Amino acid sequence: MRAACCEATVLRHEVIADDIRLLTALWPDREHAPHAGQFFTLRAWGADEAPFLSRPISVHKWDAETQTVEFLYAVVGEGTRKLTALKKGDSFQLTGPMGNGFDVAGILSKYQKIAVVGGGIGTAPMYQLTRELAAGGVKPDVFFGFRDKPYCMEEYRSIAGIVKVSTDTGAVGFHGFVTQLYDPADYDVVLVCGPTVMMRNAARLCAEKGTPCFVSLEKKMACGIGACLGCTCETRGGEGKSVCKNGPVFDAAEVF
């Protein structure tokens, strides 16, 4: 399915934590419903204004009944800083959904004991993933790591099994790495999104225990459709694949 480009309307725009925002918008195109792991590109400035590129942001939550989509994002540069100016009633350009997300139907057909692992803003797409898994009859165990203070955790309580948190500072939860919270051998599959070093470590631990692992990669993107090759990642076989088109979700054994 090709991505759609629409003018979306802001319903809410909340400050969640330091430099973390939650943007809720009305997505009017029913034929282009997003799924877990997919992303949209957002633009709240003119075509002749900097930055040149729209900003790719993963889907935090999609509600088909209300046609609303939520984006949990970190304010890290000029583009996301401009997004923070959006307020209720404003319109902005929204293009998507894009990419190959988590194959939830395929996952549910093969696995019952599922671990969802996230780090930092990499936790953003894991809420929609957890919702879709729970809707399919499996409540996954959720393990998230943060630098200092966790955010958006309460919403997992009703749709997940175990919910555990680690922090780098020890301010909340376990003092250490998120990969220390679980044993891959206890699960049929592990689904991961977060900093590259964390995903690489999670993939290694899963490989050692023989547990399948799927990761959602993050790369700077330009076109969002695989044409410019700006977000290419190299597979273990030496092949180049576009994160925006072939991913962002990959079998960890393919990319790590």
Question: Where is each model-derived feature located?
Answer:
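Structural signal for conserved beta-strand scaffold positions within catalytic alpha/beta enzyme cores
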Residues: R12, K61, V165-T167, V215, ...
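FNR/FR-type flavoprotein reductase catalytic core
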Residues: E78-K220
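Ferredoxin-reductase
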Residues: M1-K88
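Short microdomains enriched in Cys/His and/or Lys/Arg
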Residues: N246-F256
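Local cysteine-cluster metal-coordination motifs and their immediate loop/turn environment
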Residues: P125, K219-P248
